[in-house]
Each structure stands twice: as structure tokens, then as C-alpha cells.
Amino acid sequence: MYVRRLELVDFRSYERVGVDLEPGANVLVGPNGVGKTNLIEALGYVATLDSHRVATDAPLVRMGAAAGIIRCAVVHEGRELLVELEIVPGRANRARLGRSPARRARDVLGALRLVLFAPEDLELVRGDPAQRRRYLDDLLVLRQPRYAGVRTDYERVVRQRNALLRTAYLARKTGGTRGGDLSTLAVWDDHLARHGAELLAGRLDLVAALAPHVNRAYDAVAAGAGAAGIAYRSSVELASSTADRADLTAALSDALAAGRTAEIERGTTLVGPHRDELTLTLGPLPAKGYASHGESWSFALALRLAGYDLLRADGIEPVLVLDDVFAELDTGRRDRLAELVGDASQLLVTCAVEEDLPARLRGARFVVREGEVQRVG
């Protein structure tokens, strides 16, 4: 799989730009702040419907414009598919696949499989659990796009259930009875248990498959600096790490029943996949709080490379993007990383100084300036 062409209209700093890309290595060179990351952010958005930099869509649309448009031509197994997304702040995005409008924006998921490593990924190691849950769920959707719907359904149930609990909490706090009716809570418990079990099962399967890839990737990047491990820690008691849906549904139902009083007292849902954690370890110690800056950077990179390797093991050949990575690495780690990714079907690399790149990665070369991208090699 590779992206043959990317076009942006009123996206971030670009009023209009088009870039023809090549299979193999593509290097985007330019000073910081000229828009290199905006280009790869657009590709990441097509792959995940999320930005790796901001939580909402509004900053993606160029100031003063009503909407931003991303178009990319994706070639997979000899066939080209045009994917288009129109981002309208405050409204549902519109999408097209080929010549046909998509019923929902999320229908484009799976058209472009892409793994992106960026400086923000340091938060995978140092940040809060939500960062690691998002990492798992994004990778889950890349492997099996149907999980986008599972995640959306689960998040909707949590919002509805939280609204009910919050209303009851406020009513009781003020001594009133209006709004304190919890008669429908059992219905939302059932929905949460079913949708939560589906999401939890996917995550457990993913972590089991991913763990050996993480250890191998960290060893390759950090050159024997220690064993890297990952494990899934659920907010409910699980009989085993297996992903049997019926058992997981029962476990979630039991946990919701046991925690009902505490949830009413706090006005929020305290158990479920939205409260779970992906734990990261280096040797016997947790990576968060103990890993050095270099170790944290290598671990974050290993998580992305592991996802890339897992997709390839599944028979998926994703696009790999490395945003401003090599400037953070010493010469030895640069060369080892180049060895790991040199055979990617398509690799996009951004850098401020081309000399930071190992020679084997210097493929098609583009210079990025304010508002324009020019191929120079």
C-alpha cells in the first residue's frame, strides 16, 4: 500500500497544495514551523479520523475558511482509490470513496493503513492512561476497522450512563428527588457490559499479539538495553487473560452491580474499558517514572514499530511515517532504525536537516516552504 498523491485545501497552513509521492522512501525537508507535520497529520487523519496533535477538528481548518479538505489517492494491490474528507468544524465530516459519497465518515477507515510516529508519542510512556488506551484502540481499528463502530457505541453508552449518574448525584446532593430516578440504569448497565466486553476482547487479543513485537522492536532500537514488556490491566476482575465475550460480559455486569453505590455517590462510571490501563515495563520496573528520556523515547518508538510489524504479520502493508524522529537519535540508533524500516512499501520521513538521515533512507526528496511543497530529487 502507498499514497500516490495528497491534496489539501484549506487544511492547517495550506490554502491549496498537492504532492505526488513515491513508493519507498519519501523525505520532507524544511525548517521547523513551515508545514511538514501538517502534511503527515492529514494522512494520519485519513487513516484514523483523528489528529495526533489536537483533540478537536477546528484547528485543522485554515483560519477564515469554512471547511478543510483532504484528498489522497491510495494504491493497494494494483488498484487506486481516491479518498476525500471534508472537515467542517461543529458538524459531521463528509467523506467520499472513489466517486461515491460515504454514508458515514468512518466508512473510509481501512482505505489507508498508516502507522505514524511523532514527538508527541513520548506521552505514550510518560502520559496518562488515556494516551495508551487510544494507542491500543487506534491500532485495533487499523487491524479490524469494524472496531471503530464498537468504540463509538461504547463511548456513547458511557456518556449516557454518566449523564444519568450525574443527574442522580446532583439531585441527591441538593436533597431533591427530581432527576434522581435510576430506573433505567439497569438498561445502560446491560449496554455497557455488552459493548464493553466487545472492546475489551479486542484489546486483550491485541495486547497478546503485540507484546512480543514490542520487546523485539525495543531490543532492536535500544541495542540490548533491557527487556520491554506490555500488559493489560483491567478495571474489572478477569478470570484469565482470554477474550471470551460471554465471560467478559459477565465480569463487567458483576463489577457494575458491585460498584453501583460508589458510582451513584461519585456521579460517574467507575468500571469498564475506559478505566483500563496498558502497563509498560523495562525489566522489573514500570517505564513511567523510571525510564530516562532516551529510554522513554525508544519505548515509544518501539510501540509504533511493533504496531507496524504486527500489521505486516497480519498481511497488511501499511504506510510508515516518521515525523522528526532522527534528530533525537544518536548515530547508532539512526542506523538501526533505518535497517528496521528500510524495506517499507512506503516510508515518509520529515526532518529539518537532511544530514540527520542515514543514507539508505534518502529516496524521493521534497523541500517544504511556507504554503508549498517542491520535489527536488
From Swiss-Prot:
Cellular location(s) = Cytoplasm
Print the keywords alphabetically: ATP-binding, Cytoplasm, DNA damage, DNA repair, DNA replication, DNA-binding, Nucleotide-binding, SOS response
Binding site residues for ATP: G30, P31, N32, G33, V34, G35, K36, T37
Q: Does the keyword Ribonucleoprotein apply?
A: no
What domain of life does the native source organism fall in? Bacteria
Annotated PANTHER family:
DNA REPLICATION AND REPAIR PROTEIN RECF
* Family of the protein in this entry: Belongs to the RecF family.
Function per UniProt: The RecF protein is involved in DNA metabolism; it is required for DNA replication and normal SOS inducibility. RecF binds preferentially to single-stranded, linear DNA. It also seems to bind ATP.
Name the UniProt record assigns to this protein:
DNA replication and repair protein RecF
Origin organism lineage: Bacteria, Bacillati, Actinomycetota, Actinomycetes, Micromonosporales
As recorded in Swiss-Prot or TrEMBL, the protein's gene is named: recF
